[in-house]
UniProtKB/Swiss-Prot annotation:
Protein name per the record: tRNA pseudouridine synthase B
One of the Pfam families matching this protein, by short name: TruB_C_2
GO biological process annotation, one example: tRNA pseudouridine synthesis
Family: Belongs to the pseudouridine synthase TruB family. Type 1 subfamily.
Recorded GO MF terms: RNA binding; tRNA pseudouridine(55) synthase activity
Catalytic reaction equation(s): uridine(55) in tRNA = pseudouridine(55) in tRNA
Range of residues in the leader sequence: none
Amino acid sequence: MEKPFGFVVIDKPSGLTSHDCVNRLRKVFGIKKIGHSGTLDPAVTGVLPIAIGDATRLISYLQGSKAYRGIIQLGATTNTDDMQGEIIESKAWPLITQNYINYLLENFRGEILQKPPIFSSVHIKGERAYKKARKGEKFDLIPKKVTINKLNLISWSQDKGELLVDVDCSTGTYIRSLARDIGDKIGCGGYLKSLRRTKAYNFIENHSVKLPEKSDFYPEGDKPKVLNPNIFFKHLSSFELISEEEIISWRSGRKISFQNNVKRLKVTKNNEVEDSFIHNNHILVLNKENKILGIACLDDSFAIKPKVVFNAIG
């Protein structure tokens, strides 16, 4: 039986860690080689891509932004910047209009400096920030650059003091920090009340399935569908190996001559061949059936050099 290879996109429920979801799928598929592409906080729901089998070796080559829909509660701040923490200050929110809020949100669009929450996985001298925070240690975190591609105000409830927002942002952005900083900008404090991830890299909600509830016995036909990884790597240029000799060389870890085979390269949209390689971009290596054989890059001798090889020989 062919081993499963690809991605399962889970619609993560609230209350479970990302690792809980991975463990559930390990039992469902009966294999250990399963991993997620990025942690979601337990309270957060939504798109959680999980690599199955050797596809775990592709995780580091995923690329793209992440998107969320969340509710920001004005009028209070918490020590975690979300509703899981303790309220440390309360202040009535002002009478404001949706137009005024949109005006203030302009400060958070584009490239900004953002300070992570103290309850976060950021390392401080070899220790996670949240561990220091739990021990009551005082420390400061250095702001880092993040990019907010889109920040749209969907609705504003003056009665509840709630902002409903859609955010598209770079990897590493903390929506909790965004909620905190927006509340500070309005002048009354704020925290993240709820959050759902709607996109991660090229994975969207339409790809997602419910997390299996029972993991001790799962009929073969009922397992979550493993999606072909090709559709999630359209940002990479690709090169096709057409002969059995080339495929054997590739599986043996040898370089493949590229110089006389430029026509077999499919360059990503709006990208020139020179740019694709001068900047050492990664290349998806495929066979004639469009199956992924691995990941390569172009070396100084203008040959395709293996970086990840599936079904390696020797």
